[in-house]
From Swiss-Prot:
It comes from Thermotoga maritima (strain ATCC 43589 / DSM 3109 / JCM 10099 / NBRC 100826 / MSB8). The lineage of its organism: Bacteria, Thermotogati, Thermotogota, Thermotogae, Thermotogales. Its main location: cytoplasm. The gene is metK. ATP binds at H14, D174, G175, K176, R240, F241, D249, R255, K256, A272, K276. This is S-adenosylmethionine synthase. It is an enzyme of class 2 (transferase).
């Protein structure tokens, strides 16, 4: 059976991603001074204005407006003619402390309060909220990610690269990408459509822009094995994209959760990542779920693997754990679930410790996806549990 599947990504200059990066830059600054900071920071960006609000409990002191401006300038909004400029935009803040009712459940999990479990203070952290988290991996790409979102991210990263290194100096920071892949019997066989929408200077023609994007962005990214003469290419299909960024669209933290994860290939529990410290299971449990899924697939236990976790606020252990191999399991699935629960500790404190999450690593995650990347900061992408998983099945 043949079918088409599409995923999108956005550049770091997209308004929603500006907001994500500001929120995570603030989180990083606080974690750098106080690794136990409790942070939940939301950002709104619009024409000439940044609004930052949230709940923070920390010993750190950071200049939030300075962090916001620095982030905006690093993204590339450096000139007033772009309609948004890190030097001149206004920055408003409204930050207060974390609710003591929430802190009550996070600081000491229900299991500790009822005497069910004895643990040190850090291991006894309760989940910062209820929620549903999914982790996924597939062997269809070296990144163990679905091909559509992988290529969409690479195109978005390439757009930023050729803008910043001067290869295409007429590009501006805002941009979006979209890739449609044709699958046959659940295997990717070709790229059906590539869509690039990129902000640009007013004096570049549509024809010249299209030619430059094909030569310097699309051709270096799309693998030859997936190209054919039927591949459709769309570049700025409206014909013009001069007004962009926060001047054209308001941006908010947490509005690109599908871009951040698996491109719509699997379900999403709804919780966003950026601006949240790792006691928030919206973030840390998603990372742990990806870590489990990637190691399971890399160990050869399944070709595709999905795990769902759910939590209750103030309770350390997950309420439920579900797995799905889509019929690709090479081992007994009941045993696989049992092995996973024995090898991996899904309590928030244990996740934070295992993945070393109390570090200022989050700004980098806030653009081009949280998964499928091999930089040092992305500890949830490590394959250091493959051997243990194999041993559990005598492989």
């Amino acid at each position: 059976m043949r079918r088409l599947f599409t995923s999108e990504s956005v550049t770091e200059g997209h308004p929603d991603k500006i907001a994500d990066q500001i929120s995570d830059a603030i989180l990083d600054a606080m974690l750098e001074q106080d690794p136990r900071s409790r942070v939940a920071v939301e950002t709104l960006v619009t024409t000439g204005l940044v609004i930052i609000a949230g709940e923070v409990t920390t010993r750190a002191y950071v200049e939030i407006p300075d962090i916001a401006r620095k982030t905006i300038l690093e993204i590339g909004y450096t000139r007033a003619k772009y309609g948004f400029d890190g030097e001149t935009c206004g920055v408003l803040t409204s930050i207060h402390s974390q609710s003591p009712d929430i802190a009550l459940g996070v600081d000491k999990a229900l299991e500790v309060k009822t005497g069910e479990e004895v643990a040190d203070e850090f291991e006894a952290l309760g989940a910062g909220d209820q929620g549903i988290m999914f982790g996924y991996a597939t062997n269809e790409t070296p990144e163990y990610m679905p091909l559509p979102i992988t290529l969409a991210h690479k195109l978005a990263m390439r757009l930023a690269e050729v803008r910043k290194n001067g290869t295409l100096p007429f590009l501006r920071p805002d941009g979006k990408t979209q890739v449609t892949i044709e699958y046959e019997d659940d295997k990717p066989v070709r790229v059906d459509t590539v869509l690039i929408s990129t902000q640009h200077d007013p004096d570049i023609s549509q024809a010249d822009l299209r030619e430059a994007i094909i030569e310097h962005v699309i051709n270096p990214v799309i693998p030859e094995q997936y190209r054919d003469d039927k591949m459709k290419i769309l570049v700025n299909p409206t014909g013009r994209f001069v007004l962009g960024g926060p001047m054209a669209d308001t941006g908010l933290t947490g509005r690109k959760i599908i871009v951040d994860t698996y491109g719509g290939w699997v379900p999403h529990g709804g919780g966003a990542f950026s601006g949240k410290d790792p006691t928030k299971v919206d973030r840390s449990a998603h990372y742990m779920a990806r870590y489990v899924a990637k190691n399971v697939v890399a160990a050869g236990l399944a070709d595709k693997f999905l795990i769902q976790l759910s939590y209750a606020i103030g309770v350390a252990k997950p309420v439920s754990i579900m797995i799905d191999t889509y019929g690709t399991a090479k081992v007994d699935e009941d045993k696989l679930l049992k092995v996973i629960t024995e090898l991996f500790d899904f309590r928030p404190g244990a996740i934070i410790k295992k993945l070393n999450l109390l570090r200022p690593i989050y700004r980098k995650t806030a653009a081009y996806g949280h998964f499928g990347r091999n930089e040092e900061e992305f500890t949830w992408e490590k394959l250091d549990m493959v051997d243990e998983l194999k041993r559990a099945f005598n492989m």
